[in-house]
Every structure is written in structure tokens, then in C-alpha cells.
Amino acid sequence: MSENQSTATHKSIWDRAMDDVTATTNYAYLVNPSERIIEDAVKDVYDRGDVSIRMLASEQRVKSALDAFFLKAQAAEAIESDMMQIRTAEIPTVSFVVSQDTLNTIISVGETATIGELTDSNIRADLFRESETEWETGDEYTIRSPPLSRVQDRLAEKFGESVRDDFDAALERDIAVDGVILLLLLAAKHELQFYQMGGCGEDLGVGSRATFSRRKTVLSEAGVIDTESVPIDIGRPRHRLLLNDSKLANLAFPDLIQQVKRMIEQE
């Protein structure tokens, strides 16, 4: 039987489910979540740091939900820190969060979601056991992104705190942006060498040098960035990335990203 049913934003619903879980434990299964719940779960687990969530979902849904670089990097951080694990499997149509002591169903509709607490201990025990079984046979989902803190630390170490500060400002605004585009715009904003940022991004696993070159072409053709040669003693000249417009250069970094996204979409 369901009781205490309520409707609110996805984040509020997720917060309530987690408050129920953490009242007695820090370990639960999240089964068949919607894309919005996946997003909120990743952000919340990353911020809480004191929970262990096992997510069971379809591969396509997880891939779609974690498309944005910042969210993907937060998920990678949570996984590396053992706060979250993700596996894909054939799963039931109902969405729920279950621990040994609590069971909440979650229904997502548009911009809102509904949560219902199920108090029948037999149903809860059955779903917990079924989730354990599905988990054991599920396929581990690999996130092809470096953990967020690794990116932050490397940017500060290699390029300075001001570069990391701009990265963090974009993170704070939760801007959905491709990771390679993000790093190229950081480089152009701070007039860094393309070779250095491309190498850093490749070492981190954000993208290959070839991907950085392709994205640079996209930004150049959209009129966003330009380059200037940087002479070196030996070998081919390197190129420094520059923003092509003083109006772009004067924008705060999060606003720069948003403006560039609009410019690319118009191409």
C-alpha cells in the first residue's frame, strides 16, 4: 500500500527519498530512474559524499542522462569515491528507491515527479532481494570521463588558479557543454596554447588530439576563436588560442559558453 504520496520537482522528490534512506542507512538501490532523477541523483550523491547508491537502469537512459560533461565528470567522481555504482540490466517498468528499511516509488511526469512511500515490509523485502539479484547479473556501466576533481586539479596545476576558477564558475552554473569545447574556450579566454590544452585534455581522457582539432575547426568557422603563432626555438610554431571578438572576451566565462553555444547552433 502507498501512503504519504506527494508531487514536487524531481530534485525535491529525490531529496525526500534520500532523507528516508539516510535516516536508517546510507546504502540503497535506485532502480529504473528517469533521466531527470539520474541527473539529480548524481549531483546529490556527489554533494552528500556519505551515501552508497547502486543504480540499475537501461544503458540508453544512462547514456542520455549523462551526456553533459560536468554531469559525466561528477558521476565519474562519485563512482571513483565509491558513492555510486551503475549497472545496466533488463529492469522493471516501475521506478523506485529501496533499502532494507525504506521503499519509495517515483513517477516522473514532465517537469514534476510524484513519490509514494510503500510501507508493506514483505513487498519491500522482495524488491530489495530482486534488486540484489539484478545487480549481480547486471553489466557495469563505464563512464568515459575523468573524475571532476582530477580535471580541476590538473587545470590549476598546469595553467593556474584563474583557469580553474573559470572552470568552477561554469560548473556552478551547471551549464550543459561538450568537454572539449569547454576546454578550448578556457584556453581562448586565457590565451593559452592549443597544443598544451589539447595535450592536457587528451591526458585527462576528455578527448583525443584529433577531437580537439575538429572542435577547434567548429569554433573557428563559427567566428568564436582565432589563433596566433608562438615562435619556438626548435620545431614547428605553436598556436595560441584567442577569442575572435572583444565582446566575447569581456564576458564572464559561464556567459561566454552560453553565447558560444547559441553561435554554434546558428551555423
Say what each PLM segment does:
Residues 1-55, 165-168, 238, 242-247, ...:
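PLD-like (HKD) phosphodiesterase/transphosphatidyltransferase domain
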Residues 56-101:
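HKD-type phospholipase D/PLD-like phosphodiesterase module
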